């Protein structure tokens, strides 16, 4: 069954199955068809998110276990709702809490699970979980031989972690081994294990297993193997087959060796009715492979499409110039992207790169192709850096035609570099990727292609989302998952084109605007888009605020903290997160915001990897930056806070109009709207873990019961999220009543004419005799005050929407006000206050 709307709920951190069951009546009242659950399987004890699974065949006891899960399912069914769960086939926790992983540590290659994990068994399994080298930790007395508290067997004990010994190294000598205190003897015993403990700092270059991105605590799984697939999906398939679960969200599909084969097997097992979406980041213009048996993506590309509507393309260059002035240098985003990718290849993914290079050189040697290591290294490095998408989708048979064309374009681009690799090396690597090798080398070439494809995705993600987007902060709203790293022009025409394509290619994909992975909540993003409408006003505010807080800038050995560019980021981030109703004299509210903002600042600085990072933190710089950030929100900093609050008001108001437009589009454009917990009202969250905070569900439920069309006339209702919640509920119910229109209806752009034609977006959805007309304001920063109270009809004087022939013969009902009208050929916006119209044909 295809959902009409999903609601993402984050379990753990206090959210249990029973608490979720209590929310089901609210979700039904809101108009949700499917609850969309974060991972529910047993994960590490300290897990806050559930992606670090330790047992894929057990439901997490701490959130209610199997019994609690069944109570939730029963309540969902009683209310007529379905359930989608988030599954994680790519990885599990490399934790001693994981029985499979523990078995591998104990028995090494002989473990029945040795091939479940993606481990390089040509060497000892590396365990990068020490605070220093093994020798240093041993010398400091941090490691000792102790019995496992659970089994009594001898282990290497490192604080509360007990690493099991291979039976052959202690059986028959248990008392002797447990009595070991001599450091040399302990070191010798360590050398005889199938694993080797090492410093966490050495993971990037020495890891012997595939990990999720840079997270050594998450080990890759070989689900391409049928046994592994069966073992990791046993409970998942049971839940689908028994009807408890109606849909699956596949986490990080690009991490798998063969996504197409995995999805084909999964589809075969769950049947045609199961709703399947994949977490897949698409570049602009990129499409999901046609032969994947899924309904679509989880919707990051939809966020990028919305920017086409809400960014002022005519003024964004002025914002860029202002940023470069503050920064003190022009920004070349292509060069910045290259620098970020180089850092990832050379440092953060050094081990993965080295392994790939060694494999290429081994194949060259087998084929007796003369290739110098330095030459192949340069060619491989440049190919990885030049990749414009997350990955290709080659199989044992080679690359599909579209990916061959992509690879050809990349190679040609690499050849134009100022210092290009040798053509022969590029040709050799291309042959490996396309499978153009003798039969004797096909297996190794396939292995190379798989490893290459599994590296380009993490490389892109960590370079763009988790480095570049924290370094270059011209417009934080544009630094989002799925956004283009290189500047482009924004236009409604492109948005319309992308929606037509979406309707044609993945009409059942999720359309998300906030997730647990987005860099900020959808309404923070909507507010920050308005900076592109008023770059001069923003720049004047910034200069004034910097001057007000100048005395808290520190002078360090490596420069000032914050630098000018840092302040641009800090004030813009604070602009996005500031709660609409927070008053500058509200000490409790300021302190709550300060706690959240501090955590964001620390993460932003480390992700940028400029003056500090996760590997080597710069304590002096971080302290100075955090002190500055704290001072911004100090209750006694009233001169600044009052000015900040006052200056923010037009951005807040324009942002709320953007929020409404964004909501209306999400709920009426092609795709299945996904509501992230609490975002049916307003979501001004920062990057995780801030975006996983639980919303006030009691208030949301109470508020929903009281909402009427009158919310539009009350400014407070805009500020507290009632307007968005009212519109969300009204349109979700409309979707339930007109499922086929929203699923199959054509997407038809509508043309605006008149004085404010560039300030509005319009389109229609048409399916047989059913029609929907959607009109929403955009780029109204300069005159948005009246829009919040819907009293500014003069703003729209002389602005009409042209209604084409097949639509202008209908009578319509305004879904948001219940007014009935017959628009004719020209729909006058002046007679419909506020500029937001959702008209459903009678």
Give the residues covered by each predicted segment.
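Hydrophobic or amphipathic alpha-helical targeting/insertion segments
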Residues: 72-119
